UniProtKB/Swiss-Prot annotation:
This protein's pathway: Cofactor biosynthesis; (R)-pantothenate biosynthesis; (R)-pantoate from 3-methyl-2-oxobutanoate: step 1/2
Organism: Rhizobium meliloti (strain 1021)
Gene assigned in the entry: panB
GO molecular function: 3-methyl-2-oxobutanoate hydroxymethyltransferase activity; magnesium ion binding
HAMAP family on file: PanB
Protein name: 3-methyl-2-oxobutanoate hydroxymethyltransferase
């Protein structure tokens, strides 16, 4: 009898258990090569619907489809082996009913092999989160600024600037926590409120434009790598400046091709004699 051993990935439960132990590290990934580079350094990779804007040039995430998320989820799973992988439920794939959410989430887990799904929403989505979790689908919540609601909110701006917004964030975070999410992304939320809910929730909070007190942090990898120079959100730090590096590499390549210095003989195949 042979024993087959496979490397165990971090699970949603292991991410949840990190609350109070150490900060949780997360980044987005959409492709196999990037997932392979990030995998050794993060606790979980999020295949975010931000790919619609980052990879496809869409103005918002609303146009992202379930098929797109599954295709990129498969790519990230192929490129990673140790971290937990979470895939976003895109707009229109879960809001209609908890049954629709289950069908979409189950399809993502079955077709990608990922460990969990993420969905945006507060108290109004708590029943859906509980429905999924009770049926074996781990859920990463998402409160605060919710990009999928851009058409009703009128744009992307931080939330928690008045008492009404603060009350809503508190209510949303508690509802998603009580529903059983293993962690909750807190996006674009004023720092004191993000700090407060982090201290009161069972589930770890993952901040993006929130607070250093959050239990973990996430950034869009392309932002972190400095691939976009035209717009830099306040909460983004460039840990590299790859945009000019890539541009210079393309320029050098173009110049060598035009000068016929590339390819050289060393880059060609010869007949063996």
């Amino acid at each position: 009898m042979s024993v087959q051993t496979t490397k165990r990935r971090l699970s949603p439960a292991s991410i949840e258990a990190l609350k109070g132990e150490r900060p949780i590290v997360s980044l987005t990934a959409y492709t196999t090569p990037i997932a392979r580079l990030l995998d050794p350094h993060v606790d979980f990779l999020l295949v975010g619907d931000s790919l619609g804007m980052v990879l496809y040039g869409l103005d918002t995430t609303v146009g992202v489809t379930l098929d797109m998320m599954i295709a990129h989820g498969q790519a990230v799973m192929r490129g990673s082996e140790r971290c937990c992988v979470v895939v976003d439920l895109p707009f229109g794939a879960y809001q209609e009913s908890k049954e629709q959410a289950f069908r979409s989430a189950a399809r993502i887990l079955k077709e990608t092999g990922c460990s969990a799904v993420k969905l945006e929403g507060g108290a109004e989505m708590a029943e859906t989160v509980e429905f999924l979790v009770s049926r074996g689908i781990p859920v990463l919540g998402h409160v605060g600024l919710m990009p999928q609601l851009v058409n009703t909110t009128g744009g992307y701006r931080s939330v928690g600037r008045n008492e009404k917004e603060v009350a809503k964030i508190r209510r949303d975070a508690k509802a998603i926590d009580d529903a059983g999410a293993f962690a909750i992304v807190v996006e674009g939320t004023v720092e004191p409120v993000a700090r407060e809910i982090t201290a009161t929730l069972r589930a770890p909070t993952i901040g993006i434009g929130a607070s250093p007190a959050c239990d973990g942090q996430i950034l869009v990898s392309d932002d972190m790598l400095g691939l976009f120079n035209d717009f830099k959100p306040r909460f983004v730090k460039h840990f590299a400046e790859l945009a000019p590096t890539i541009s210079k590499a393309a320029e050098a390549y173009a110049n060598e091709v035009k000068a016929r210095s590339f390819p050289g003989i060393e880059h060609t195949f010869q007949v063996k004699r």
